[in-house]
Amino acid sequence: MGAVTTDVEVASSVPAQTIYKGFLLDMDNIIPKVLPQAIKSIEIISGDGGAGTIKKVTLGEVSQFTVVKQRIDEIDAEALKYSYSIIEGDLLLGIIESITSKFTVVPTDGGCIVKNTTIYTPIGDAVIPEENVKEATEQSGMVFKAIEAYLLANPGAY
């Protein structure tokens, strides 16, 4: 079947630099703080925090999954781009080789637009269930909205 790709764009009234720093660069700290039931912790297991860094993400009690390994693929602070791939873990269902999320934050008058492309790469000819992709897209949207609400309530945080 091949890879499955989703594209999502979300407008926000939070400034682009704030979204980039809070939502993407500091996700290790902000997500467990804002959504501890979804993600308990994120820790670096190798690397310096830049491209190539591997992180262990321990998921919270609302997730049916437990732990994933995530690799940072790109950090471009000037272009406000960030990408990472999930490369190990039960979330891959034994049929997905990797899930790559690519973010670009685009400044607008009074805020920004966050563009996210997610690529689900199957193992061999495996078919990735459409409902899993839809659920993951919805959950990502909920995480973004929760972090956006935190950033709006704490304008000096980033």
From Swiss-Prot:
Pfam families: Bet_v_1. GO terms for molecular function: abscisic acid binding; protein phosphatase inhibitor activity; signaling receptor activity. This is Pathogenesis-related protein 2. GO terms for cellular component: cytoplasm; nucleus. PROSITE patterns: PATHOGENESIS_BETVI. It comes from Petroselinum crispum. The keyword Transport does not apply. Gene3D superfamilies: 3.30.530.20. Keywords: Pathogenesis-related protein, Plant defense. Belongs to the BetVI family. GO terms for biological process: abscisic acid-activated signaling pathway; defense response. It comes from the Eukaryota.
